[in-house]
Amino acid sequence: MDAGGEEEKQERHRVDGASPSMVALRSDVLHAVLGGKSHNQDTSELVTLSEWSKNKFPLYAYAAAFMFLVMQEYDKRSHGIDFLNRDFVVRDLGMPSLNKHFPVKEFYCSYRRKSGHSTYTYGFFMLQKLILIQNAHIRREEEEEGACSMVTTSHRTGHSRSVGLAARDDPTAEMRLVQGEGSVGTTSHRMGALLERWISREGRTDGGDTSVQGERSVGTTSHRMGALLDVGSAVDDPAKQRSAMGNSLPVESKFTDEKENDRIKYVVSSMQGWGEKMEDAHAAILNLDDTMTSFFGVYDGHGGAEVASYCAKRFHIELCNHEDYDSNLSNAMRSAFYSMDEDLQLSDAWRELVIPRNNGWMYFLKAAACTSICKATYTEPAYEGSTACVVVIRGNQLIVGHAGDSRCVLSRNGQASALSVDHKPDRDFACKKNERLPPEDQMLTCNPDILTMDITDDMEFLVIATEGLWCNMTNQNVVDHTHDRLLEGAEARVICEELVQFGLPSGDNTTVILVLFKPGAYPAVPPVDTDTDTDSHTGDDVDNNDPANEVDPTANAGSDDSNTSDEVKVDATATAVGSSSTTAVAADEATVVSLSTATITIVDNYFFINTSEEVDPTANAGSDDSNTGDEVKVDATASSGLSDWELIYSEF
């Protein structure tokens, strides 16, 4: 290299505060990354500071070039470019050459170890070590509180946003570090002791929580790993600094969606609030299987958003695929809970649905050949999971299933009715534990509570929400507010967003699904009436006490000309009449027939009664020509009565 080039390199060294070899490596890294292919370079001087990836890029290059980890605010078009088909955002990590070529909106960032996940902390050790080489600085108070944050491009406390924005135009401004108390400095020779202390903290037993809860600020809105730093003035409110989940300011932007058909209308709205990230997920499907079946579910994740997101994408599919979906929806729903839990425990394949292959820290670490880190991630007990509160509306039936503390509340003429009971450690879990087992051996179950009920005209709406709402409002408060606002003519969308806003003080994420039943769409279930039955053709009442209307129990239903194949189709809601001889009203013919010697056949949830001839209750129904091999036969005797009829129906 000529003398001019050598002088230029020395000048860059003086500007950047890095060694000449580091500057040269940066130039090589830049060309390698821009070229998008493997680049061989001499790393003999950095052999202890690098770990080669499968495509021969040193881990240092990845750490310096990419902001790995998924960010909720990330937009590739506005935040950065796509390097090597990886959706990582270019950030200011002490590489002015990259930032000069690829300016982005926000380039101040920090890396913070995820709370409660000490198993993969070592995966960030190498990155922290390499980033610290790039003139990083650690605050003493974070170190004392066990917050292993990796902060680059720090600024003085109280610096305004304008100071940070102005620094973008000056590539050297990012290298000007605050040499405050406890800082590392600009050279790497002081790093050894700090890194040793950092490593020693991996044996902590406090769950690995490294969140910064101090009252001082460095002029940033601190987020944990994977989020941006909002460079601005310090937050003066200690309560907000010590918020329940780590944010200095709540994220009050809401996601809202609504749809309707001729029977129901739903609105779903969600808000991150004070949560450090959004761990709620939901599913709202108006037509689940191209029928009048609707599905609604809210899922409140803990330990991360992955499980909740997986449930929102997969639960209703498991439900539809179950063999009992058509015949026994309650059983299918219970089985879906078990199936989801089994999928989550037996394999990590489900993560493919919620962690994009080209946009996540896991794939970044795999690309960097950190095999030991990846293995350690999944070998320890899982600390992530999700609640589930799901509602299925099929025809005139409402089925609710839930596990956890998400809740479903029904408004019936303005009165709140809880359709679920929260599962909390201080409630039914106390009854389920085995007192002879130590706490670490006590098991929790995914067995859900299932409720099935008929929809009636006095039902107004359902509110399905995560814990964020119910922490601040009672069931009746929610119903009163929604009911009053509907009477005022407020839009359902506005009402749902108001409910979400009520969950802000809880410090948790909040998701609300509001389901409105349209008037007249769900007729009330006819009450049991032993006096009269209405003829569906003439509208005349049939008095069962009138001797003229009595039916001979031994009479054949074949006398009805409209009865084909000697069968009468009976609706599932047909009412049994009498006690000594069981009778029923055919839904389409309103013909009273005898069940004393009849054989009931169930096909696709319809009841068929063969009364063309006397049938032995123990005989096979094969004598009925209309009976197919797929039909299920149920025998009824004269002593069945109303309760037996209901029992027969409930079993199918």
From Swiss-Prot:
<feature type="region of interest" description="Disordered">
    <location>
        <begin position="524"/>
        <end position="567"/>
    </location>
</feature>
<dbReference type="GO" id="GO:0007165">
    <property type="term" value="P:signal transduction"/>
</dbReference>
<keyword id="KW-0904">Protein phosphatase</keyword>
<comment type="similarity">
    <text>Belongs to the PP2C family.</text>
</comment>
<feature type="binding site">
    <location>
        <position position="300"/>
    </location>
    <ligand>
        <name>Mn(2+) 2</name>
    </ligand>
</feature>
<dbReference type="InterPro" id="IPR036457">
    <property type="entry name" value="PPM-type-like_dom_sf"/>
</dbReference>
<dbReference type="GO" id="GO:0046872">
    <property type="term" value="F:metal ion binding"/>
</dbReference>
<protein>
    <recommendedName>
        <fullName>Probable protein phosphatase 2C 19</fullName>
        <ecNumber>3.1.3.16</ecNumber>
    </recommendedName>
</protein>
<feature type="domain" description="PPM-type phosphatase">
    <location>
        <begin position="265"/>
        <end position="517"/>
    </location>
</feature>
<dbReference type="InterPro" id="IPR000222">
    <property type="entry name" value="PP2C_BS"/>
</dbReference>
<keyword id="KW-0460">Magnesium</keyword>
<dbReference type="InterPro" id="IPR015655">
    <property type="entry name" value="PP2C"/>
</dbReference>
<feature type="binding site">
    <location>
        <position position="301"/>
    </location>
    <ligand>
        <name>Mn(2+) 1</name>
    </ligand>
</feature>
<dbReference type="InterPro" id="IPR001932">
    <property type="entry name" value="PPM-type_phosphatase-like_dom"/>
</dbReference>
<feature type="binding site">
    <location>
        <position position="467"/>
    </location>
    <ligand>
        <name>Mn(2+) 2</name>
    </ligand>
</feature>
<dbReference type="Pfam" id="PF00481">
    <property type="entry name" value="PP2C"/>
</dbReference>
<feature type="binding site">
    <location>
        <position position="508"/>
    </location>
    <ligand>
        <name>Mn(2+) 2</name>
    </ligand>
</feature>
<keyword id="KW-0479">Metal-binding</keyword>
<keyword id="KW-0378">Hydrolase</keyword>
<feature type="binding site">
    <location>
        <position position="300"/>
    </location>
    <ligand>
        <name>Mn(2+) 1</name>
    </ligand>
</feature>
<keyword id="KW-0464">Manganese</keyword>
<dbReference type="GO" id="GO:0004722">
    <property type="term" value="F:protein serine/threonine phosphatase activity"/>
</dbReference>
